[in-house]
From Swiss-Prot:
Entry GO CC: cell surface; extracellular region; phosphopyruvate hydratase complex
Protein name per the record: Enolase
Native organism taxonomy: Bacteria, Pseudomonadati, Pseudomonadota, Gammaproteobacteria, Vibrionales
Cofactor note: Binds a second Mg(2+) ion via substrate during catalysis.
UniProt similarity note: Belongs to the enolase family.
GO MF annotation: an example: phosphopyruvate hydratase activity
Binding-site residues, Mg(2+): D246, E291, D318
Single GO BP term: glycolytic process
Organism, as annotated: Aliivibrio fischeri (strain ATCC 700601 / ES114)
Length: 432
């Protein structure tokens, strides 16, 4: 019934016009699972390797034919005849066959696409939705929740061609009673933000994740125009809508000088000074979550940041932890941050992703499920968020179908589950 009879890989195009890997897993029962690997722009140095061809004459070197060949060759040969329901075994076969610590032979993009396609095929064979299958794989059958969205409505940093240093300014519709209502609040704020920006003569062009990408006078101004938009939409900042930021500070950290160089504002900071700068912003605005507030290697600075802000703010490690249980375990032991961002392709398989979520939750850390700046119509992260009851999701703004695909899947899931999947809002955020 759930025996694998064929594994197929192909090169498709992602939301930034770059190739990525799509995989299909076919079962003897006729069921097929299909999934695509996302791709990041601001990446942690310790992420699993995304295998690119490097042939400058083709897709400027970004082709993924080598990764696709791994899917159609050694991965397919190893998996045919195996039971798709045994997700951990399937993932381990691919990891062992690759034989490297960072999936450098086949590419995390190849292994992940097959891993997720396998989960989808197994769910279909069990006649259950993907989120329900994920809950079973997670050891929490029937336990679901709808995630609080973090909507990236102003893009800066590596996600936009503008002068804003901080990469993401997000809103969270904490006053909503349901996920669907939260999306409505987000959409209304998003449209009002367009009006606010236009009234000030700013561009309303969007960045990689669907948020606006204007040139602003400062990072504080980004928060100010969002505050105006929230009010214009008829909501109360701090009550109906809270704020979150992804600094992606590794992108503006000068390793040689050991300083944070915010070129957009013409300011430089030491680790400690930047922590106090963030504290000041959090005092001025109802910011409840800060991601990658320092460089991924600045563990001393992160420890200070956690001591300074960790009791009142969610401090999320993305480049810091890269969805890796070994690195997360070190962070937990040292008391660094209090939350982890979960990105499938940072680690490269569903099984390892579930292990990172479990480790975080067991330690009292929150887990925020996340997209990447390079996405496809694949909406698996929506099912992951619900199936692990993670509580929070980052999947961009209220524009670009590669972002909205995930929100629409969440709407469908909420409709199907009803009261079985509560929307807990701000209660999901660490420190709130």
């Amino acid at each position: 019934m759930s025996k694998i009879v064929k594994v197929l890989g192909r090169e498709i195009i992602d939301s930034r016009g770059n190739p990525t890997v799509e995989a299909e897993v076919h079962l003897e029962s006729g069921f097929v699972g299909m999934a695509a690997a996302p791709s990041g722009a601001s990446t942690g140095s310790r992420e699993a390797l995304e295998l690119r061809d490097g042939d400058k004459a083709r897709f400027l070197g970004k082709g993924v034919l080598k990764a696709v060949a791994a899917v159609n060759g050694p991965i397919a040969e190893a998996l045919v005849g195996k039971d798709a329901k045994n997700q951990a075994e399937i993932d381990q076969i691919m990891i062992d066959l690759d034989g490297t610590d960072n999936k450098a032979n086949f590419g995390a993009n190849a292994i992940l696409a097959v891993s997720l396609a396998n989960a989808k095929a197994a769910a279909a064979a069990k006649s259950m939705p993907l989120y329900a299958h994920i809950a079973e794989l997670n050891g929490t059958p029937g336990v679901f929740s709808m995630p609080l969205p973090m909507m990236n409505i102003i893009n800066g940093g590596e996600h936009a061609d503008n002068n804003v240093d901080i990469q993401e300014f997000m809103i969270q519709p904490v006053g909503a009673k349901t996920l669907k209502e939260g999306l409505r609040i987000g959409a209304e704020v998003f449209h009002n933000l367009a009006k606010v920006l236009k009234s000030k003569g700013y561009s309303t062009a969007v960045g990689d994740e669907g948020g606006f990408a204007p040139n602003l006078k400062s990072n504080a101004e980004a928060l100010e125009v969002i505050a105006e938009a929230v009010a214009a939409a008829g909501y109360e900042l701090g009550k109906d809508v809270t704020l979150a930021m992804d600094c992606a500070a590794s992108e503006f950290f000068d390793k040689e000088a050991g300083i944070y160089n915010m070129k957009g504002e013409g300011k430089t900071f030491t680790s400690e000074e930047f922590n106090h700068y963030l504290a000041e912003l959090a005092n001025q605005f109802p910011i409840v979550s800060i991601e990658d507030g320092l460089d991924e290697s600045d563990w001393t600075g992160f420890k200070h940041q956690t001591e300074l802000l960790g009791d009142k703010l969610q401090l999320v490690g993305d480049d810091l932890f890269v969805t890796n249980t070994k690195i997360l375990a070190e962070g937990i032991e040292k008391g660094v941050a209090n939350s982890i961002l979960i990105k499938f392709n940072q680690i490269g398989s569903l099984t390892e992703t579930l292990a990172a979520i479990k480790m975080a939750k067991d330690a009292g850390y929150t887990a925020v499920i996340s997209h990447r700046s390079g996405e496809t119509e694949d909406a698996t992260i929506a099912d992951l968020a619900v199936g692990t009851a993670a509580g929070q999701i980052k999947t961009g703004s209220m524009s670009r179908s590669d972002r909205v695909a995930k929100y629409n899947q969440l709407i469908r899931i909420e409709e199907a589950l009803g009261e079985k999947a509560p929307f807990n809002g701000l209660k999901e955020v660490k420190g709130q």
